Amino acid sequence: MYSEVTRSIRVTVRPEYLAQQSQPEERRFVWAYHVRIENEGLETVQLRTRHWQVTDAQGRVQEVRGPGVVGEQPVLRPGEAFEYTSGTPLPTPSGFMVGSYGMVTASGEAFEVRIPAFSLDSPHGRSRPN
């Protein structure tokens, strides 16, 4: 697991290689990543946007930006958490992801929360970038 805290918001990520959805002979490798976002602070916040950088084993970077996560813009009161699972395919047997969430406090202050860098590893990769 990978975890990072920004302004009392903890983001924990657990990647998982999906062998049944992957087709190594066709250079298609698929991962799920399970995310937990916890508000360890004293103020209510809302997740508004996401930004991911997905890098494959050859150094090619794909940027992903959009509103919310899995169709939601969750509000997290102090002590609350939100969990979701998403996925990503790569043309290489390994890679890594890193990113951020755009958050806003109940008083309207916007800030970025870091998503920790995490490895996407499969049993088909010889070298691992992370």
Curated annotation (Swiss-Prot):
This is Protein ApaG. GO terms for biological process: error-free translesion synthesis. Pfam families: DUF525. The gene is apaG. PANTHER family: F-BOX ONLY PROTEIN 3, POLYMERASE DELTA-INTERACTING PROTEIN 2. Disulfide bonds: none annotated. It comes from Rhodospirillum centenum (strain ATCC 51521 / SW). Residues 3-127 form the ApaG domain. InterPro entries: ApaG_domain, ApaG_sf, Uncharacterised_ApaG.
